[in-house]
């Protein structure tokens, strides 16, 4: 969601799903954190649109392009995917975050697994599958159905397949 778009300005009756971009993963604790204070203030305003459109689902997107830029979050997804303990912490935090903000699901936007120029590692390919599988299993244990989507970037997948 662009900063200039407020939830109240989103036309209803057009979309079945909305993804709010973004929330972040703390690189030290693996807990979910708002991208900024401004985005945190919009979470509940966006999920409140569900009261005005029957069947609308709102997901939180986590990560994004600059999440793998040089800096403290560059290897966060790789570190998360490589550790079941970190995943368990992440899952607990994510579920609490979604419940608190009334989200219906999550979109994992990891750009780019395995890309060494974006902080990736060769083992990301297999670890990502395990991460998504474990998250789906964990979400399926909850009384409410939560959606899970992933953002895949085709150029990375082609790069892996070429190896």
Predicted features, each with a name:
Residues 72-163:
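Active-site cleft segment of glycoside hydrolase catalytic domains centered on the general acid/base Glu
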Residues 1-98, 123-126, 134:
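Glycan-recognition patch characteristic of GH18 chitinases/ENGases
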């Amino acid at each position: 969601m662009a900063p200039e778009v407020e939830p109240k300005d989103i036309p209803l009756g057009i979309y079945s799903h909305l993804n709010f971009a973004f929330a972040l993963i703390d690189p030290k604790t693996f807990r979910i954190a708002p991208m900024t204070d401004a985005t945190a203030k919009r979470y509940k305003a966006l999920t409140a649109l569900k009261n005005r459109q029957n069947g609308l689902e709102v997901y939180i997107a986590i990560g994004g392009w600059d999440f793998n830029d040089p800096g403290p979050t560059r290897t966060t997804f790789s570190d998360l995917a490589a550790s079941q303990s970190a995943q368990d912490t992440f899952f607990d935090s994510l579920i609490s975050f979604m419940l608190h903000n009334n989200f219906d699901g999550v979109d994992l936007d990891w750009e780019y697994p395995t890309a060494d120029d974006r902080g990736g590692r060769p083992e990301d390919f297999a670890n990502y599958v395990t991460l998504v599988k474990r998250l789906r299993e964990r979400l399926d244990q909850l009384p409410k159905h939560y959606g899970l989507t992933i953002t895949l970037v085709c150029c990375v997948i082609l790069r892996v397949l070429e190896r």
